[in-house]
Amino acid sequence: MKQIDSEDSITVPNDTPEDNSASSMQPVMSNLSIEEHQSENEPIEQEQADAKDPLLSKYHLACQQGDLATVKEIIENGVIDLKHDYDDVERVSGLHWASINNRLSVVRYLISKDVDVNFQGGELNATPLHWAARYGYVYIVDYLLEHGADPSVTDAQGFNLLHLSINSSNIMLVIYVLFFVIDDKLDIDCVDPNGRTALLWAAYQGDSLSVETLLKFRASVKATDKGGFTPLHWGTVKGQAQVLKHLIENGADFFQKTADGKNCFAIAHDMNTTGSLVGALYQCGFNKEGFAIPVYFKKSLHTKLVTFFAPWIFIGVLFKCFASIHPIFSLIFSILLGLGMRYTLKKYVIPAYAQRNTRQSFLKTPFLAGVFSGSVFWASYTWLTRIMPLTLIEEPITNLLFFAGVVLLASLFVKLVRSDPGLIPEETDHSKVKETIKELLNVGKFDAKHFCISTWVRKPIRSKFSNFSRALVTRFDHFCPWIYNDIGLRNHKTFLFFILCLETCIFVFLKLCMEYFDVLEDTFEDDYDLNCGIFGEDLCAGFFFDTFTFLVLAWTCFQGIWVGFLTFVQLFQTAKGVTNYEFSTLSKRRHNHDSSVNEYFTTTPLELIDEEEADPLNPVIPGNNPRDPLMQKSRTCFGICWTLTGLDQFVMVIKETFGVAQREEPRNNILSFKISTDYGWRTNLKDFWLTSDITAPTWQRFLYSPSCSKALLNGEEVDYFKLYKLPERHYLAEEIV
């Protein structure tokens, strides 16, 4: 952040939300060095120095830059009277300047000298609390409130602490104010002179995080300003779909009219935000006219079962169709059948339990889990009815192995679908949330990196909030649509057993099919002269004499290819002691050169910044660099398939491991970035494959997954629910891979 040298930079008109759009900026950092501040702002400082007392200018400059030594020298020498440390024209005190520049040490010192924390000055007649809140400086706000600052005081625009917190768009400050100020000193629906509540301002700014949090504290969606606008009306003006969705879900009336007789549909038409409004309506169960979409199933379980079993039927019909009629007609029929099934599911089935009108919604349903299980079903059916009767005598062990593999595979699949990936429960006790916030403030870690803004708990290292599970997942790896669940600490090992078992079953099935086709060739070789070009005689016999089984084999082998890539990636990342999510984030972070994005809403003062914050395991989420191919999420059909099969991760591993992504840079390590949880391959594998219960037999530690939140990390037992610091690394050089 640039140092603030003039109140003009924070002046906000008091007319309409349009005039106040400048105040809805993202939180900004104020951790530049003094030298940077001096070079950037020297002309303004000199102009100010010419206009007022040089000693006062020096004092204010020291407050702005956090030069505590100079501030102490001036105060203790009696050069400045703290009861009058401002210019009579500007009326901006040293505490104002220290507050708006996030200089906590100066703020502490000035308050220790009994300055007036509620002194109102500047063009807006605002207090230091207002100045700090406008820029989202939660540490300054906390300290000022603890030392007597009054949150109910309003500035010349009629804004109090809550309004200015919303204007800052810093969700961390909003959460702090809601927990520590609202109800006791402020009403959540308090209004400014134009009748606008905090929720109305957040909706206009398109700040979905603040809107969601305000609604959790029961902010009114029915409140109207002097123009008759509700939060939904102003949200429609902005056109942020998530904001509209949150408001509609909480009972906002989209038919309600403003004072000039316009409802949300008319406003959306005028502001060209109809697409956002219609999308939000569909996600909340309404059509584009605002009427409820009919639901044809009473229980979501029933609709999920329909979605799950639909691919079973489709795959069987598809194989039978291609095995029975001409390929051209089969292709046309299959496309029509697929489109019809997709339309039916999205219109009549999925709306009963999933969000609508989003490209990713279909992937967050049991459909792909049904595709996998349906594939296993038809492979098993083919084996049981066609392959086994003709190969049991020749290959009894192989048939028994396939049967055992399918049973184990089905058991692991059911276990994974029903498993707990390691969910950290949401904290509902507000007193405990307050304790957590204060604890993080004291150590300089109250930001979205260390505090979950959705579940209100301190975020352990290696955890991530899952939109699917709506909870924090410990040692989060990825969401797997093929098992309809997240993969985390408590089911990651089971998942690896699952894909290893699946790959083994595919190879065994291939061997049995080739033996079966050989039997068919021997049976019919005297009656037919087969010629299939590049295919061998066995495959040719299978294609001609049992096309259905041939197609099942082809589909199964295709699955085996991408599962093989997935297995390689998982085993590689396990040996490196990193999860899929961590590896992807680290790779993207290396390619991201935009350091201006503050995705974690960090406003930690310099005095509280910890060196551990340089830990690359929890990096700042990359910004949007359209020229960086690794930063782009493909929205094409091919791109989605590429992601679903895990081939994108395989390519990323190859690039980062062998330097394909960055050939121009000299590299001494096997990876182009440091992994904080890589303790050497032996230790990493032990941490992953063995539970932390050293009293249990080794076989049990290997086969069982963690039953609680405790697991090994660097050979030590750690509680992943409370993992806030990584164990120190100590591994041998020969262990590095």
Swiss-Prot record:
Record domain DHHC: where: 450-500
Lumenal topological segments: 386-396, 515-547
Coiled-coil regions, chain positions: none
Enzyme Commission numbers on file: 2.3.1.225
Subcellular location: Early endosome membrane; Golgi apparatus membrane
GO cellular component, one term: early endosome membrane
Membrane side Cytoplasmic: residue ranges: 1-304, 347-364, 418-493, 569-737
Catalytic residues in the record: 480
Keywords attached to this entry: Acyltransferase, ANK repeat, Endosome, Golgi apparatus, Lipoprotein, Membrane, Palmitate, Repeat, Transferase, Transmembrane, Transmembrane helix
One Pfam family in the UniProt entry: DHHC
SMART domains given in the database record: ANK
TM region(s), chain numbering: 305-325, 326-346, 365-385, 397-417, 494-514, 548-568
InterPro entries in UniProt: Ankyrin_rpt, Ankyrin_rpt-contain_sf, Palmitoyltrfase_DHHC
SUPFAM superfamilies: Ankyrin repeat
GO molecular function: protein-cysteine S-palmitoyltransferase activity
Renumbered residue ranges of the record's region Disordered: 1-47
Catalytic activity entry: L-cysteinyl-[protein] + hexadecanoyl-CoA = S-hexadecanoyl-L-cysteinyl-[protein] + CoA
Function per UniProt: Palmitoyltransferase specific for casein kinase 1.
Written domain comment of the UniProt record: The DHHC domain is required for palmitoyltransferase activity.
Family: Belongs to the DHHC palmitoyltransferase family. AKR/ZDHHC17 subfamily.
Official protein name in the record: Palmitoyltransferase AKR1
